[in-house]
Amino acid sequence: MKYFHRTSATPEEVLETAKRFFGSRLVPAEETARRLGYRGTTGKLTVSALPEGGHYTFVEVMTDQVGESELDKLAKRFLSEVHRTVEPGHEVRGAY
């Protein structure tokens, strides 16, 4: 599954948020300037953060799962955490 988010956070901020969020949950598998990869018992996950026109960053989170799994729930939760870095008052309401 692929999940997308557009944010005003910088690519560096997004990747630091990913390290904090996934670092205690999954094993790091890959790290480049704009991409992080993780793996665990639930599957593989990659996060990429690319500068987009203007002041935005395009965030893509991809899992190797075909349907909504526990890993996909983590991916969606992470995107809400990215949103919270820009808007600290953001309240996460999803059941993930």
Whereabouts are the PLM-identified features?
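Conserved short-loop catalytic and cofactor-binding motifs
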Residues: 2, 35, 59-62
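A general marker of short, structured functional hotspots
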Residues: 17-18, 34, 92
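Short, hydrophobic/aromatic-rich segments at coil-to-beta transitions
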Residues: 30-38
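Beta-strand/loop substructures that line and gate deep hydrophobic ligand-binding cavities in soluble
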Residues: 41-96
